[in-house]
Design a protein with these regions (language model features):
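Asp-box/BNR beta-propeller loop motif
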Residues: 1-10, 53-65, 105-117, 152-165, ...
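Long, acidic/polar, low-complexity amphipathic helices and coiled-coil-like
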Residues: 1-45
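Residue-level signature of beta-propeller blades and closely related beta-rich strand-turn architectures
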Residues: 41, 92-94, 143, 215-217
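Conserved blade-ending motifs and adjacent loop-strand segments that build the rim/top face
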Residues: 167-177, 184-193
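Structural motif
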Residues: 45-51, 96-103, 146-151, 219-228
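Entry beta-strands of beta-propeller and related beta-repeat scaffolds
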Residues: 33-37, 84-88, 135-138, 206-211
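Short coil/turn segments at the loop-to-beta-strand junctions that recur within blades
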Residues: 8-11, 68-74, 120-125, 168-172, ...
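Repeated scaffold domains used in trafficking and secretory/extracellular systems
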Residues: 21-28, 72-79, 123-130, 173-176, ...
């Protein structure tokens, strides 16, 4: 059974190059809450602010709420953790030098009203966002060479952030610098020289958070095919290295 969402389709956020696939993160469909973010751009005839439309009865009735007068949005993320508490992230004002601004909103009344709580930890382009609950969330940015990590964590809903540090491990003896002599100890690659680009964390129904640390686009260790898998069972307070494994970065699939 399908339900009609009372939104002009031109105001929805689509994946790049698509006219039918909604942008990942811009909508939520569960048994208890259905929500779509739209607007934040110039429509064909008028400005449409960043707006959330949601239903608590599987599409029978809909409520809309305008969040912000932003008209150059590029990224959306919406999630609800129970019937009352939810979060929205809006990325906007992207520049040619691959910078972007962010606003983080929270609701405690099911989506009726929203409060701006923060602007994110950095202005890089987002790879993705994942919240565990109304307090704990992760911002993962596209990696650029020279970055000291691309994964950040908040414990207060988005007011403040800290960089996620994953425990280093030992590499085997084949991990040598491509420009250095294999006889010089200082020329051996270290763990964080190889595994440096985090993918967006995931969380399972038991609350276990998983992060894959990849080699980025220029990886050469194990032909660039392996990633390091880490997990946390305490909402990101501590992390345990699981193993190295082959992974496809684009879809987080592993072998």
């Amino acid at each position: 059974m399908y339900a009609t969402v009372p939104v002009d389709v031109e105001n929805l956020m689509y994946e790049s190059g698509s006219t039918s696939t909604l942008k990942d993160g811009s909508y939520l469909i569960t048994t208890s809450k259905t929500a779509f973010l739209f607007g934040g751009r110039m429509g064909s005839s008028k400005k449409v602010p960043v707006t959330l439309i949601y239903s608590d009865d599987k599409g029978v009735n809909w409520t809309s709420c305008e969040l912000d007068n932003i008209y150059n949005a590029e990224d959306y993320y919406v999630d609800f953790f129970d019937e009352n508490n939810g979060v929205i992230v809006c990325g906007y004002a992207r520049t040619d030098n691959e910078k972007e601004s962010y606003r983080i909103y929270q609701t405690a009344n099911g989506g009726e009203t929203w409060t701006t709580v923060g602007s994110g930890p950095a202005n890089y382009i987002l790879k993705g966002v994942m919240y565990v609950d109304e307090n704990v969330g992760f911002f993962c940015y596209n990696y650029a060479e020279g970055m000291d990590g691309n994964l950040y964590m908040t414990k207060d809903g988005g007011k403040t952030f800290s960089k996620v540090t994953l425990p280093e491990q030992e590499l085997d003896s084949t991990a040598k610098s491509s420009t250095a002599s294999s006889t010089v100890a200082d020329d051996e690659l270290k763990w964080n020289d190889v595994y440096k680009e985090a993918l967006v964390p995931t969380v399972d129904d038991k609350g276990i958070i998983t992060v894959y640390l990849t080699q980025g686009s220029d990886g050469t260790y194990n032909d660039g095919k392996t990633a390091a898998k880490y997990q946390s069972s305490d909402k990101g307070d501590t992390w345990v290295f699981v193993r190295q494994l082959e992974i496809t970065q684009n879809n987080n699939k592993h072998n």
